[in-house]
């Protein structure tokens, strides 16, 4: 889904519709979006393994049920991010193809229901799911709204109402490896960027499509959260105060994830990381110390006491997740790409995000091999150093689609802010250009799903990730074509 959003105008109308239809075809009755469908040979392989395990455990009854469903598609609903990406996808489609309601009103055959259904009804089921999921945080926020804003945003009782990964799971978003969220249970990219973006998309669509028909759909399908919002619409402009409050509330949810470090604290933590991290070789330690932090200050100069201008005010970033105690998991990460592309950052946040992306690893995210997905170097938690290494699937590595999302988001915001903040616009354009140059320099590796880094003389360079990297990219996987989006980067995404 994110790939379709990133590709945007590069995709034809019919291709975009095909992507949405495949999502709607796998939609659960409650509007939950399937992350992946393991169909045909994949589902068959999984069930054969399950069958063999049950036979080994001498369970007689259950294997026969598995054989009955041997070739049935196996839908995976364990992720939470998909539910919030889909409304943005629908919104972008309607914005790009204004006046074309044929897809929304289309009658289709559902393989899950095994009968005909309607796209509009299924889209509204998803919207209801999103609104329902967002309401607990909003209701708690309203109850606490008489207190000072900063105190409210920091309250654990409020943070506990954020969107949590599903019980018993270790992942809930695109970082779907066991430790991809650093052990956290509240995903940063979901709560900071995707929920507000999805609510804004839903509100725009409901204003556009508002009718008695929508209310009928909500009533007939028991979509109570959606119906409440529709009933709150008033005036000729069809506005909903409740929906606007819901959006405003969620736009402030990012405060829970904020990490603020002074210059001295950064120095202390970075020194600790370089000295105590036994996963670093002496060779890599020496390279790190010699890396330029700024033009006239190396990493070793900084940890020995030099204070470059760019760090005098310290730094702020959003943690990769919140742990079970609702404390930020202090890992710098590339998820700000969602913020740039989905228009979910203000000027100050963009300035800080550009700073984080621009400076060299281990101080920030930039390497000669590309933009790092995660960097735990300023965390005092040694476990995070182990969870997010250069060999971890979602660790100190580079993901191709994340690079492209960042590049396209930066170029989009550079154009948008050119007339109001030229200095920031130029910085974003420069950073995007540098990232594109890096990708061009690493050659065919840029088409891999991901790659990692290793120390080489005076920098960290791109190297293939694990085994079989060359076979990870193919045309069936839409993300493999994501770099095509940069053929026309300045259109609104």
Pin down the residues of each PLM region.
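Acidic, mature catalytic/reactive cores of soluble proteins
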Residues: 1-493
């Amino acid at each position: 889904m994110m790939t379709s959003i990133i590709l945007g105008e590069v995709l034809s109308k019919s291709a975009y519709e095909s992507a949405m239809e495949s999502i709607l075809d796998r939609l659960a009755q409650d509007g939950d979006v399937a992350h992946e469908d393991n169909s045909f040979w994949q589902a068959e392989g999984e069930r054969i393994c399950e069958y063999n395990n049950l036979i080994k455990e001498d369970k007689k009854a259950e294997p026969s049920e598995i054989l009955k469903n041997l070739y049935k598609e196996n839908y995976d609903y364990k992720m939470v991010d998909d539910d919030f990406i889909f409304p943005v996808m629908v919104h972008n489609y309607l914005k790009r193809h204004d006046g074309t309601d044929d897809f929304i009103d289309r009658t289709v055959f559902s393989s899950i229901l095994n009968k005909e259904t309607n796209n509009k009804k299924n889209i509204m089921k998803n919207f209801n799911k999103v609104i329902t999921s967002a309401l607990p945080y909003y209701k708690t926020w309203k109850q606490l709204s008489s207190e000072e804003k900063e105190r409210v945003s920091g309250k654990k009782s409020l943070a506990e109402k954020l969107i949590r990964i599903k019980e018993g799971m270790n992942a809930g978003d695109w970082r779907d490896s066991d430790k991809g969220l650093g052990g956290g249970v509240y995903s940063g990219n979901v709560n900071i960027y995707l929920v507000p973006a999805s609510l804004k998309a839903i509100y725009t669509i409901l204003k556009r499509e508002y009718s008695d028909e929508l209310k009928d759909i909500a009533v007939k399908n028991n979509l109570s959260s959606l119906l409440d919002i529709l009933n709150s619409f008033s005036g000729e402009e069809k506005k909903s105060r409740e929906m606007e409050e819901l959006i405003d509330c969620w736009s402030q949810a990012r405060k829970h994830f904020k990490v603020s470090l002074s210059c001295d604290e950064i120095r202390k933590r970075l020194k600790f990381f370089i000295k105590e991290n036994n996963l670093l070789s002496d060779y890599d330690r020496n390279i790190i110390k010699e890396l330029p932090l700024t033009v006239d200050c190396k990493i070793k100069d900084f940890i020995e006491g030099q204070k470059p201008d760019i760090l005098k005010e310290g730094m702020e970033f959003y943690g990769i997740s919140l742990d079970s105690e609702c404390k930020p998991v202090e890992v710098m990460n590339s998820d700000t790409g969602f913020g740039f592309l989905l228009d979910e950052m203000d000027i100050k946040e963009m300035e800080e995000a550009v700073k984080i992306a621009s400076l060299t690893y281990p101080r920030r995210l930039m390497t000669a091999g590309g933009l790092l997905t995660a960097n735990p170097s300023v965390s005092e938690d040694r476990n995070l150093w182990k969870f997010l290494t250069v060999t971890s699937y979602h660790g100190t590595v580079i993901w191709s689609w994340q690079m492209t999302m960042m590049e396209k988001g930066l170029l989009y915001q550079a154009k948008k802010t050119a007339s109001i903040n030229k200095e920031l616009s130029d910085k974003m354009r420069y950073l995007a250009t540098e990232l594109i140059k890096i990708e061009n320099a690493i050659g065919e590796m840029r088409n891999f799903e991901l790659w990692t880094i290793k120390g080489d003389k005076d920098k960290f360079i791109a190297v293939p990730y694990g085994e079989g990297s060359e076979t990870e990219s193919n045309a069936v996987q839409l993300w493999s074509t994501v770099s095509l989006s940069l053929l026309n980067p300045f259109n609104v995404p």
